[in-house]
Curated annotation (Swiss-Prot):
EC number(s) given by UniProt: 4.1.99.22
Enzyme kind, highest EC tier: lyase
Subunit structure: Monomer and homodimer.
GO biological process: Mo-molybdopterin cofactor biosynthetic process
Pathway: Cofactor biosynthesis; molybdopterin biosynthesis
Cofactor: [4Fe-4S] cluster
Domain Radical SAM core: 4-226
Gene Ontology MF annotations: 4 iron, 4 sulfur cluster binding; cyclic pyranopterin monophosphate synthase activity; GTP 3',8'-cyclase activity; GTP binding; metal ion binding; S-adenosyl-L-methionine binding
Record: residues binding [4Fe-4S] cluster 1: 20, 24, 27
Catalytic reactions of this protein: GTP + AH2 + S-adenosyl-L-methionine = (8S)-3',8-cyclo-7,8-dihydroguanosine 5'-triphosphate + 5'-deoxyadenosine + L-methionine + A + H(+)
Protein name (Swiss-Prot/TrEMBL): GTP 3',8-cyclase
Source species of the chain: Heliobacterium modesticaldum (strain ATCC 51547 / Ice1)
Record-listed [4Fe-4S] cluster 2 binding positions: 254, 257, 271
Length: 327
């Protein structure tokens, strides 16, 4: 599908649940969220029909997200069914890693190509402060399980926050000297709980690179790795993995955006950073034809803005939490 700005839209991010077994400070309130009624969340067969229709319109890549997607019962056979769909070339999953020791091998056998693991600190006490629950050792066990299952490339997503974990960027980069993993540093975005933290904790990509340079780390250029996302990759001399940067704010990558997002409640978002959502669940459950649902996907592509407006005044007045969007 080609949008109004000649971008090839071929990537669909699918949030299969709003539930999560962590409470990360930039993602959701400490008390959690009122859970969406199960009847409002799409059934797997509904997701599958929509993904198949999207594939018929040109979607080739699918990323499964949450919440935490591995908490949803039946996720492994769902991955297997998506992977075998006509037109789908790549299926990936974003997770906090806690359940990977249980699921990594099964996911690989089901056809999952790769995983992104969210991890914002390497320090046990700080991990508890950022996630509010959980143990960092469990995440590392999950990372090792993903590597053992050959879910390559294994990527670590690190949201950098000033005064919280910005003093760890060099430590994260050094992981690539010891492990065949790809560490991606992500700028904090003013979405949901991140909105209230943005002004005081936002760290630019250039500031992150400067912190690495202060500790003697020299980043060389790297052509990039499989994934089709917005990260720009570098490498340290002798490293087994890479260091990537995702600059949603300081140097937005909207000009090369290639994706749509489908929420757990069946809302199609043309842009992660837009308030616009197009309802798919209602027509789907009212018996809409595949042709009608395909036209809704086309409508979403036509509605994609050229770029986000997260820094505009009033952006955060009606926030949608990251865990609800499936960012």
């Amino acid at each position: 599908m080609i949008d109004a700005f000649a971008r090839d839209i071929h990537y669909l991010r699918v949030s299969v649940t709003d539930r999560c077994n962590l409470r990360c400070i930039y993602c959701m309130p400490e008390a959690g969220l009122p859970l969406v009624d199960h009847r409002e969340v799409l059934r797997f067969e509904e997701f599958e029909r929509l993904i198949a229709i999207a594939a018929s319109q040109g979607i080739r890549r699918v990323r499964i997200t949450g919440g935490e997607p591995l908490v949803r019962k039946g996720i492994v056979p769902f991955v297997a069914r998506v992977k075998t769909m006509t037109g789908i070339e790549d299926v990936a999953l974003t997770t906090n890693g806690l359940l990977l020791p249980r699921f990594a091998s099964e996911l690989k056998a089901a056809g999952l190509d790769r995983v992104n693991i969210s991890l914002d600190t390497l320090r046990p006490e700080r991990f508890r402060a950022v996630t509010r629950v959980g143990r960092i050792d469990d995440v590392w066990t999950g990372i090792e399980a993903a590597l053992a299952a050959d879910l390559h490339p294994v990527k670590l997503n690190v949201v950098v926050m000033g005064g919280v974990n910005d003093d760890e960027v060099a430590d994260f980069a050094r992981l690539t000297l010891q492990w065949p993993i790809h560490v991606r540093f992500i700028e904090l975005m003013p979405i949901g709980e991140g909105d209230s933290r943005f002004r005081g904790q936002y760290v630019t990509i250039e500031q992150m690179k400067a912190k690495m340079a202060e500790q003697g780390l020299r980043l060389g250029d790297h052509p990039g790795i499989r994934g089709g996302g917005p990260a720009r990759y570098h490498t340290l001399a002798g490293a087994l993995g890479t260091v990537g940067f995702i600059s949603a704010i300081s140097k937005h990558f909207c000009g090369t955006c290639n994706r749509l997002r489908l929420t757990a409640e069946g809302k199609l978002r043309p842009c992660l950073h837009s308030r616009q959502e197009i309802d798919l669940r209602t027509p789907l459950r009212r018996g809409a034809s595949d042709n009608l649902l395909a036209r809704i996907f086309q409508k979403a592509v036509e509605a994609k803005p050229y770029q986000h407006h997260m820094l505009d005044e009033g952006w955060g007045d009606r926030p949608r939490l990251m865990s609800q969007i499936g960012g």
